[in-house]
Design a protein with these regions (language model features):
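Two-component/phosphorelay signaling modules centered on CheY-like receiver
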Residues: 10-28
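Helix N-cap/capping motif at the beta->alpha junctions
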Residues: 28-41, 63
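Active-site beta3 strand of CheY-like receiver
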Residues: 43-53
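Active-site T/S-Asp motif of two-component receiver
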Residues: 52-55, 66
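Receiver (REC) domain active-site loop signature in two-component systems and cognate sites
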Residues: 58
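Alpha4 helix (beta4-alpha4-beta5 surface) of REC/receiver domains from two-component response regulators
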Residues: 65, 77, 82-83, 94-110, ...
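A Lys-centered signature of the CheY-like receiver
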Residues: 113-114
Length: 134
């Protein structure tokens, strides 16, 4: 399994990596622009990501805009909704406006508010069907 962790804070990236590393390879991006480039490259190389963990507040292009661009690119490539990359928004923004934007405009799969624990993230990844119970 492949994961793309997108966060401008190194501590958050390390926590997410620690959580996901037992399940697959982790790549990193520090802003939305890098995330879009990494996502497109992986898709074009036929080695797509299974999950993107995306922060919202980042320099350059924020997480909300990056998710919209990723979904737009998937649509242009003819990827059906059931085959789209799973995206978990992992952010300090717990307000309804950001959650609604993530789900309805960006079509995020899930939304977690920081701080998060390893257990909470893995529970969410299980809920979206990427990790199966033994």
């Amino acid at each position: 399994m492949r994961f793309l962790i997108v966060d401008d804070e190194i501590t958050s990236r390390k926590i997410l990596q620690k959580s996901l590393k037992p399940y697959g390879a982790c790549d990193f991006a520090v802003n939305g622009a890098e995330a879009i480039i990494s996502f497109k490259k992986a898709l074009e190389e036929d080695c797509p990501y299974d999950l993107i963990c995306m922060d919202i507040m980042m320099p350059n292009i924020d997480g909300q805009q990056a998710v919209k661009e990723i979904r737009k690119f998937e649509k242009e490539k003819g990827i059906k909704p059931k085959k789209e990359v799973k995206i978990i928004m992992v952010t300090a923004l717990g307000d309804p406006k950001n959650a609604v934007e993530a789900f309805y405009q960006g079509r995020a799969t899930s939304y977690l508010v920081k701080p998060i624990s390893v257990e909470k993230l893995i529970e969410e990844v299980k809920k979206i069907g990427l990790i199966r119970e033994p």
